[in-house]
Amino acid sequence: MKNLRQVFSWCLFDFANSSYSAVIAAVVFPVYYATTIVGNDVGQGDLWWGRAISFSMAFVALSSPFLGGMADYSGRRKRFLLIYTTLCVCAVACFSLLREGMVIEGFILILVANIGMEGGLVFYNAFLPEISEKEYQGRVSAWGFGIGYAGSILSLLLALPLVRAGRFAETWIMVSFFFAVFSLPAIILLPRDNKTGLSVLGSAAKGWTYFVSVMRQISGNPELRKFLLSYLAYEDGVNTVIVFSSIFAATTLGFSPQELIGLYLIVQVTALTGAFIMAKPIDLWGPKNVVLLSLLLWSSVAVSAYFIAAKMHFFILASFAGLGLGTVQAASRALFTQFIPEGKESEYFGTYSLVGKSSAVFGPLVFGYISSNFNSQRPAILAVSLFFIAGFFLLLSVNGGGPNVRKKG
Protein backbone atom coordinates (compact mmCIF):
# COMPACT_ATOMS: atom_id res chain seq x y z
CA MET A 1 0.00 0.00 0.00
CA LYS A 2 1.31 3.43 -0.96
CA ASN A 3 1.15 5.38 2.30
CA LEU A 4 -0.52 4.00 5.41
CA ARG A 5 -0.54 7.40 7.13
CA GLN A 6 -2.49 8.91 4.24
CA VAL A 7 -4.87 5.95 4.18
CA PHE A 8 -5.47 6.26 7.93
CA SER A 9 -6.04 10.02 7.69
CA TRP A 10 -8.48 9.47 4.81
CA CYS A 11 -10.45 6.93 6.85
CA LEU A 12 -10.37 9.22 9.87
CA PHE A 13 -12.11 11.92 7.84
CA ASP A 14 -15.06 9.52 7.51
CA PHE A 15 -14.94 9.14 11.29
CA ALA A 16 -15.05 12.93 11.60
CA ASN A 17 -17.92 13.71 9.25
CA SER A 18 -20.04 10.88 10.65
CA SER A 19 -20.68 13.10 13.66
CA TYR A 20 -22.56 15.42 11.31
CA SER A 21 -24.43 12.57 9.62
CA ALA A 22 -25.56 11.08 12.94
CA VAL A 23 -26.24 14.03 15.24
CA ILE A 24 -27.13 16.79 12.77
CA ALA A 25 -28.64 15.10 9.72
CA ALA A 26 -30.33 12.08 11.28
CA VAL A 27 -31.09 12.11 15.00
CA VAL A 28 -30.94 15.19 17.22
CA PHE A 29 -30.97 18.38 15.15
CA PRO A 30 -33.92 17.44 12.86
CA VAL A 31 -36.19 17.14 15.90
CA TYR A 32 -34.75 20.28 17.50
CA TYR A 33 -35.26 22.36 14.36
CA ALA A 34 -38.73 21.00 13.57
CA THR A 35 -40.16 21.15 17.09
CA THR A 36 -38.23 23.90 18.91
CA ILE A 37 -37.12 26.35 16.22
CA VAL A 38 -40.14 26.05 13.90
CA GLY A 39 -42.82 24.34 15.98
CA ASN A 40 -44.34 21.20 14.52
CA ASP A 41 -47.94 21.40 15.75
CA VAL A 42 -49.38 21.60 12.22
CA GLY A 43 -46.52 20.03 10.30
CA GLN A 44 -44.65 23.27 9.61
CA GLY A 45 -41.45 21.86 11.10
CA ASP A 46 -41.66 18.91 8.71
CA LEU A 47 -42.24 21.28 5.81
CA TRP A 48 -39.22 23.48 6.56
CA TRP A 49 -36.92 20.54 7.31
CA GLY A 50 -37.98 18.83 4.09
CA ARG A 51 -37.31 22.01 2.13
CA ALA A 52 -33.86 22.43 3.67
CA ILE A 53 -32.79 18.88 2.83
CA SER A 54 -34.30 18.94 -0.67
CA PHE A 55 -32.92 22.33 -1.67
CA SER A 56 -29.41 21.64 -0.36
CA MET A 57 -29.23 18.23 -2.03
CA ALA A 58 -30.57 19.66 -5.29
CA PHE A 59 -27.80 22.25 -5.21
CA VAL A 60 -25.15 19.61 -4.55
CA ALA A 61 -26.53 17.31 -7.25
CA LEU A 62 -26.59 20.09 -9.87
CA SER A 63 -23.11 21.28 -8.94
CA SER A 64 -21.53 17.80 -8.64
CA PRO A 65 -20.37 17.57 -12.29
CA PHE A 66 -18.60 20.91 -11.89
CA LEU A 67 -17.15 19.95 -8.49
CA GLY A 68 -15.98 16.65 -9.95
CA GLY A 69 -14.20 18.52 -12.73
CA MET A 70 -12.57 20.82 -10.20
CA ALA A 71 -11.42 17.78 -8.19
CA ASP A 72 -10.05 15.88 -11.18
CA TYR A 73 -8.65 18.58 -13.45
CA SER A 74 -7.67 21.64 -11.40
CA GLY A 75 -5.30 19.87 -8.98
CA ARG A 76 -6.89 21.70 -6.03
CA ARG A 77 -8.61 18.84 -4.20
CA LYS A 78 -7.22 19.56 -0.76
CA ARG A 79 -7.98 23.29 -0.95
CA PHE A 80 -11.63 22.67 -1.84
CA LEU A 81 -11.93 19.89 0.74
CA LEU A 82 -10.75 22.39 3.36
CA ILE A 83 -13.14 25.10 2.12
CA TYR A 84 -16.21 22.87 2.13
CA THR A 85 -15.32 21.27 5.47
CA THR A 86 -14.80 24.68 7.06
CA LEU A 87 -18.15 25.81 5.64
CA CYS A 88 -19.91 22.88 7.29
CA VAL A 89 -18.07 23.14 10.61
CA CYS A 90 -18.73 26.88 10.95
CA ALA A 91 -22.40 26.54 10.03
CA VAL A 92 -22.90 23.80 12.63
CA ALA A 93 -21.16 25.94 15.27
CA CYS A 94 -23.58 28.75 14.39
CA PHE A 95 -26.51 26.45 15.19
CA SER A 96 -25.74 27.33 18.81
CA LEU A 97 -27.01 30.87 18.12
CA LEU A 98 -30.45 29.69 17.00
CA ARG A 99 -33.44 30.41 19.20
CA GLU A 100 -37.13 29.56 19.03
CA GLY A 101 -38.77 31.21 16.02
CA MET A 102 -35.53 31.72 14.02
CA VAL A 103 -36.93 29.64 11.16
CA ILE A 104 -35.26 31.39 8.22
CA GLU A 105 -31.90 31.72 9.95
CA GLY A 106 -31.97 28.01 10.78
CA PHE A 107 -33.03 27.15 7.25
CA ILE A 108 -30.09 29.08 5.78
CA LEU A 109 -27.61 27.50 8.20
CA ILE A 110 -28.90 24.00 7.36
CA LEU A 111 -28.47 24.75 3.65
CA VAL A 112 -24.90 25.94 4.17
CA ALA A 113 -23.97 23.04 6.48
CA ASN A 114 -25.42 20.36 4.21
CA ILE A 115 -23.85 21.85 1.09
CA GLY A 116 -20.50 21.99 2.90
CA MET A 117 -20.83 18.39 4.04
CA GLU A 118 -22.07 16.83 0.78
CA GLY A 119 -19.94 19.02 -1.49
CA GLY A 120 -16.83 18.18 0.50
CA LEU A 121 -17.47 14.47 -0.06
CA VAL A 122 -16.88 14.96 -3.79
CA PHE A 123 -13.29 16.04 -3.09
CA TYR A 124 -12.84 13.51 -0.28
CA ASN A 125 -13.83 10.59 -2.53
CA ALA A 126 -11.53 11.86 -5.29
CA PHE A 127 -8.49 11.17 -3.06
CA LEU A 128 -9.09 7.40 -2.93
CA PRO A 129 -7.37 6.50 -6.24
CA GLU A 130 -4.47 8.77 -5.29
CA ILE A 131 -3.72 7.22 -1.90
CA SER A 132 -4.34 3.56 -2.69
CA GLU A 133 -3.51 1.11 -5.44
CA LYS A 134 -6.50 -0.23 -7.33
CA GLU A 135 -6.32 -3.67 -5.73
CA TYR A 136 -6.62 -2.11 -2.25
CA GLN A 137 -9.29 0.51 -2.96
CA GLY A 138 -12.21 -1.74 -2.03
CA ARG A 139 -10.59 -2.53 1.30
CA VAL A 140 -9.72 1.10 2.03
CA SER A 141 -13.25 2.19 1.16
CA ALA A 142 -14.66 -0.47 3.50
CA TRP A 143 -12.29 0.65 6.28
CA GLY A 144 -13.57 4.20 5.90
CA PHE A 145 -17.14 2.94 6.00
CA GLY A 146 -16.52 0.93 9.17
CA ILE A 147 -14.62 3.72 10.93
CA GLY A 148 -17.44 6.06 9.94
CA TYR A 149 -19.92 3.88 11.83
CA ALA A 150 -17.64 4.09 14.87
CA GLY A 151 -17.65 7.89 14.53
CA SER A 152 -21.45 7.92 14.42
CA ILE A 153 -21.71 5.84 17.57
CA LEU A 154 -19.07 7.80 19.52
CA SER A 155 -20.53 11.19 18.59
CA LEU A 156 -24.01 10.08 19.67
CA LEU A 157 -22.65 8.79 22.98
CA LEU A 158 -20.92 12.16 23.51
CA ALA A 159 -24.14 13.97 22.62
CA LEU A 160 -26.31 11.87 24.93
CA PRO A 161 -25.49 13.57 28.29
CA LEU A 162 -25.74 17.03 26.68
CA VAL A 163 -29.10 16.25 25.11
CA ARG A 164 -30.38 14.68 28.33
CA ALA A 165 -29.51 17.93 30.14
CA GLY A 166 -31.17 20.05 27.43
CA ARG A 167 -27.83 21.68 26.50
CA PHE A 168 -28.45 21.69 22.76
CA ALA A 169 -26.22 24.67 21.95
CA GLU A 170 -23.29 22.80 23.47
CA THR A 171 -24.26 19.72 21.45
CA TRP A 172 -23.81 21.60 18.17
CA ILE A 173 -20.48 23.01 19.37
CA MET A 174 -19.37 19.48 20.27
CA VAL A 175 -20.24 18.21 16.78
CA SER A 176 -18.40 21.05 15.05
CA PHE A 177 -15.36 20.48 17.29
CA PHE A 178 -15.48 16.71 16.68
CA PHE A 179 -15.67 17.21 12.91
CA ALA A 180 -12.89 19.81 12.88
CA VAL A 181 -10.43 17.94 15.10
CA PHE A 182 -10.72 14.53 13.46
CA SER A 183 -10.62 15.98 9.94
CA LEU A 184 -7.28 17.69 10.62
CA PRO A 185 -5.12 14.61 9.87
CA ALA A 186 -6.67 14.41 6.39
CA ILE A 187 -6.12 18.11 5.77
CA ILE A 188 -2.49 17.79 6.86
CA LEU A 189 -1.47 14.35 5.55
CA LEU A 190 -3.40 13.81 2.31
CA PRO A 191 -1.38 14.50 -0.86
CA ARG A 192 -0.64 18.14 -1.56
CA ASP A 193 -2.40 19.96 -4.35
CA ASN A 194 -0.63 19.69 -7.67
CA LYS A 195 -2.02 22.49 -9.78
CA THR A 196 -2.45 21.61 -13.44
CA GLY A 197 -2.45 25.12 -14.87
CA LEU A 198 -6.14 24.79 -15.69
CA SER A 199 -8.26 27.46 -14.00
CA VAL A 200 -11.06 26.59 -11.59
CA LEU A 201 -13.67 27.67 -14.14
CA GLY A 202 -11.90 25.79 -16.90
CA SER A 203 -11.72 22.60 -14.85
CA ALA A 204 -15.40 22.95 -13.87
CA ALA A 205 -16.35 23.32 -17.54
CA LYS A 206 -14.27 20.26 -18.41
CA GLY A 207 -16.05 18.33 -15.67
CA TRP A 208 -19.42 19.25 -17.19
CA THR A 209 -18.28 18.19 -20.67
CA TYR A 210 -17.08 14.88 -19.27
CA PHE A 211 -20.37 14.38 -17.44
CA VAL A 212 -22.38 14.97 -20.62
CA SER A 213 -20.18 12.43 -22.42
CA VAL A 214 -20.85 9.79 -19.74
CA MET A 215 -24.59 10.51 -19.82
CA ARG A 216 -24.59 9.93 -23.57
CA GLN A 217 -22.93 6.56 -23.03
CA ILE A 218 -25.54 5.67 -20.41
CA SER A 219 -28.39 6.75 -22.68
CA GLY A 220 -27.24 4.07 -25.12
CA ASN A 221 -27.77 1.36 -22.47
CA PRO A 222 -31.53 0.97 -21.86
CA GLU A 223 -31.10 -1.53 -19.02
CA LEU A 224 -28.76 0.80 -17.15
CA ARG A 225 -31.18 3.70 -17.70
CA LYS A 226 -34.02 1.69 -16.20
CA PHE A 227 -31.91 0.63 -13.23
CA LEU A 228 -30.83 4.21 -12.48
CA LEU A 229 -34.45 5.38 -12.70
CA SER A 230 -35.45 2.63 -10.29
CA TYR A 231 -32.53 3.50 -8.00
CA LEU A 232 -33.53 7.17 -8.07
CA ALA A 233 -37.04 6.24 -6.93
CA TYR A 234 -36.33 3.80 -4.12
CA GLU A 235 -33.23 5.59 -2.83
CA ASP A 236 -35.37 8.73 -2.49
CA GLY A 237 -37.61 6.71 -0.20
CA VAL A 238 -34.63 5.43 1.80
CA ASN A 239 -33.19 8.93 2.23
CA THR A 240 -36.57 10.34 3.26
CA VAL A 241 -36.95 7.71 5.96
CA ILE A 242 -33.44 8.49 7.21
CA VAL A 243 -33.96 12.27 7.50
CA PHE A 244 -37.51 12.08 8.92
CA SER A 245 -37.48 8.96 11.10
CA SER A 246 -36.37 10.80 14.23
CA ILE A 247 -38.92 13.59 13.69
CA PHE A 248 -41.68 11.01 13.15
CA ALA A 249 -40.66 9.10 16.27
CA ALA A 250 -40.51 12.26 18.40
CA THR A 251 -43.64 14.01 17.10
CA THR A 252 -46.02 11.12 16.43
CA LEU A 253 -44.83 8.56 18.97
CA GLY A 254 -43.42 10.83 21.69
CA PHE A 255 -39.83 9.56 21.72
CA SER A 256 -37.45 11.44 24.02
CA PRO A 257 -34.03 12.58 22.70
CA GLN A 258 -32.37 9.76 24.65
CA GLU A 259 -34.71 7.21 23.09
CA LEU A 260 -33.99 8.62 19.63
CA ILE A 261 -30.27 8.08 20.12
CA GLY A 262 -30.92 4.50 21.23
CA LEU A 263 -33.14 3.99 18.19
CA TYR A 264 -30.43 5.21 15.84
CA LEU A 265 -27.81 2.98 17.44
CA ILE A 266 -30.08 -0.03 16.90
CA VAL A 267 -30.47 0.91 13.24
CA GLN A 268 -26.70 1.21 12.85
CA VAL A 269 -26.10 -2.24 14.32
CA THR A 270 -28.84 -3.91 12.27
CA ALA A 271 -27.68 -2.16 9.08
CA LEU A 272 -24.20 -3.61 9.53
CA THR A 273 -25.76 -6.99 10.34
CA GLY A 274 -27.91 -6.86 7.22
CA ALA A 275 -24.98 -6.01 4.98
CA PHE A 276 -22.96 -8.89 6.48
CA ILE A 277 -25.74 -11.52 6.39
CA MET A 278 -26.77 -10.73 2.82
CA ALA A 279 -23.24 -10.52 1.38
CA LYS A 280 -23.27 -14.15 0.23
CA PRO A 281 -26.91 -14.19 -0.99
CA ILE A 282 -26.11 -11.18 -3.20
CA ASP A 283 -23.71 -13.45 -5.10
CA LEU A 284 -25.84 -16.60 -4.91
CA TRP A 285 -29.28 -15.15 -5.68
CA GLY A 286 -28.13 -12.18 -7.74
CA PRO A 287 -28.16 -8.53 -6.57
CA LYS A 288 -31.40 -7.73 -8.40
CA ASN A 289 -33.37 -10.31 -6.42
CA VAL A 290 -31.83 -9.10 -3.17
CA VAL A 291 -32.74 -5.47 -3.96
CA LEU A 292 -36.30 -6.54 -4.82
CA LEU A 293 -36.54 -8.41 -1.52
CA SER A 294 -35.20 -5.35 0.32
CA LEU A 295 -37.78 -3.10 -1.36
CA LEU A 296 -40.59 -5.40 -0.25
CA LEU A 297 -39.20 -5.08 3.28
CA TRP A 298 -38.95 -1.27 3.01
CA SER A 299 -42.50 -1.00 1.64
CA SER A 300 -43.78 -3.11 4.53
CA VAL A 301 -41.89 -0.94 7.03
CA ALA A 302 -43.35 2.30 5.63
CA VAL A 303 -46.91 0.93 5.57
CA SER A 304 -46.56 -0.56 9.06
CA ALA A 305 -45.30 2.77 10.43
CA TYR A 306 -48.64 4.30 9.46
CA PHE A 307 -50.42 2.07 11.99
CA ILE A 308 -47.86 1.87 14.80
CA ALA A 309 -48.70 3.56 18.09
CA ALA A 310 -46.39 1.88 20.64
CA LYS A 311 -42.74 2.81 21.03
CA MET A 312 -41.62 -0.80 21.43
CA HIS A 313 -43.25 -1.71 18.14
CA PHE A 314 -41.39 1.12 16.45
CA PHE A 315 -38.08 -0.10 17.91
CA ILE A 316 -38.79 -3.50 16.35
CA LEU A 317 -39.79 -1.91 13.05
CA ALA A 318 -36.60 0.18 13.04
CA SER A 319 -34.57 -3.02 13.42
CA PHE A 320 -36.12 -4.40 10.25
CA ALA A 321 -35.53 -1.07 8.50
CA GLY A 322 -31.87 -1.28 9.50
CA LEU A 323 -31.57 -4.76 8.01
CA GLY A 324 -33.07 -3.42 4.78
CA LEU A 325 -30.79 -0.38 4.81
CA GLY A 326 -27.53 -2.31 4.90
CA THR A 327 -28.81 -4.82 2.37
CA VAL A 328 -30.19 -2.41 -0.23
CA GLN A 329 -27.02 -0.30 -0.23
CA ALA A 330 -24.70 -3.27 -0.74
CA ALA A 331 -26.91 -5.00 -3.32
CA SER A 332 -27.57 -1.83 -5.33
CA ARG A 333 -23.88 -1.15 -5.71
CA ALA A 334 -23.24 -4.77 -6.74
CA LEU A 335 -26.05 -4.60 -9.30
CA PHE A 336 -24.74 -1.35 -10.76
CA THR A 337 -21.29 -2.84 -11.31
CA GLN A 338 -22.76 -5.34 -13.77
CA PHE A 339 -23.56 -2.53 -16.19
CA ILE A 340 -20.12 -0.87 -16.13
CA PRO A 341 -17.88 -1.37 -19.19
CA GLU A 342 -14.36 -2.48 -18.30
CA GLY A 343 -12.10 0.48 -17.60
CA LYS A 344 -15.03 2.87 -17.04
CA GLU A 345 -15.50 2.26 -13.30
CA SER A 346 -14.50 5.73 -12.09
CA GLU A 347 -16.69 7.77 -14.42
CA TYR A 348 -19.71 5.47 -14.06
CA PHE A 349 -19.55 5.48 -10.28
CA GLY A 350 -19.40 9.28 -10.45
CA THR A 351 -22.78 9.16 -12.18
CA TYR A 352 -24.04 6.61 -9.63
CA SER A 353 -23.05 9.00 -6.84
CA LEU A 354 -24.81 11.88 -8.61
CA VAL A 355 -28.04 9.88 -8.87
CA GLY A 356 -27.70 9.04 -5.18
CA LYS A 357 -27.46 12.72 -4.26
CA SER A 358 -30.39 13.57 -6.54
CA SER A 359 -32.47 10.96 -4.74
CA ALA A 360 -32.74 13.12 -1.63
CA VAL A 361 -34.62 15.90 -3.44
CA PHE A 362 -38.25 14.84 -3.94
CA GLY A 363 -39.00 12.55 -1.00
CA PRO A 364 -38.33 15.09 1.79
CA LEU A 365 -40.48 17.66 -0.03
CA VAL A 366 -43.32 15.16 -0.41
CA PHE A 367 -43.16 14.19 3.27
CA GLY A 368 -43.06 17.82 4.41
CA TYR A 369 -45.95 19.00 2.25
CA ILE A 370 -48.22 16.05 3.04
CA SER A 371 -47.52 16.33 6.77
CA SER A 372 -48.31 20.06 6.79
CA ASN A 373 -51.44 19.71 4.63
CA PHE A 374 -52.91 16.76 6.55
CA ASN A 375 -51.60 17.95 9.93
CA SER A 376 -50.34 14.41 10.48
CA GLN A 377 -47.15 12.53 9.73
CA ARG A 378 -48.91 9.21 9.23
CA PRO A 379 -50.16 9.87 5.67
CA ALA A 380 -46.72 11.33 4.90
CA ILE A 381 -44.90 8.13 5.89
CA LEU A 382 -47.49 6.12 3.96
CA ALA A 383 -46.74 8.22 0.87
CA VAL A 384 -43.05 7.33 1.19
CA SER A 385 -43.96 3.69 0.53
CA LEU A 386 -44.88 4.73 -3.03
CA PHE A 387 -41.19 5.45 -3.74
CA PHE A 388 -40.31 1.87 -2.79
CA ILE A 389 -43.21 0.42 -4.77
CA ALA A 390 -42.29 2.48 -7.85
CA GLY A 391 -38.66 1.41 -7.55
CA PHE A 392 -39.73 -2.22 -7.19
CA PHE A 393 -41.76 -2.31 -10.39
CA LEU A 394 -39.18 -0.31 -12.35
CA LEU A 395 -36.49 -2.75 -11.25
CA LEU A 396 -38.61 -5.74 -12.28
CA SER A 397 -38.34 -4.55 -15.88
CA VAL A 398 -34.53 -4.43 -15.76
CA ASN A 399 -32.85 -7.24 -17.69
CA GLY A 400 -29.93 -8.16 -15.46
CA GLY A 401 -28.99 -8.81 -11.89
CA GLY A 402 -27.69 -12.37 -12.23
CA PRO A 403 -24.11 -13.51 -12.89
CA ASN A 404 -24.16 -11.54 -16.15
CA VAL A 405 -26.36 -8.87 -17.69
CA ARG A 406 -28.56 -10.42 -20.30
CA LYS A 407 -29.20 -8.27 -23.31
CA LYS A 408 -32.54 -8.36 -25.05
CA GLY A 409 -32.88 -9.75 -28.54
Task: Describe each model-derived feature in a short phrase.
Residues 22-46, 243-260:
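Short amphipathic helix-loop junctions that connect adjacent transmembrane helices
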Residues 139-159, 353-363:
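Glycine-rich segments within core transmembrane alpha-helices of 12-TM secondary carriers
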Residues 91, 102-120, 313-327:
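Hydrophobic core of transmembrane alpha-helices in multi-pass small-molecule transporters
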Residues 178-189, 382-409:
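Multi-pass alpha-helical transporter architecture, strongest
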Residues 79-94, 289-304:
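Structural signature of the two symmetry-related core transmembrane helices
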Residues 62-76, 273-287, 371:
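Helix-to-loop junctions at the C-terminal end of transmembrane segments
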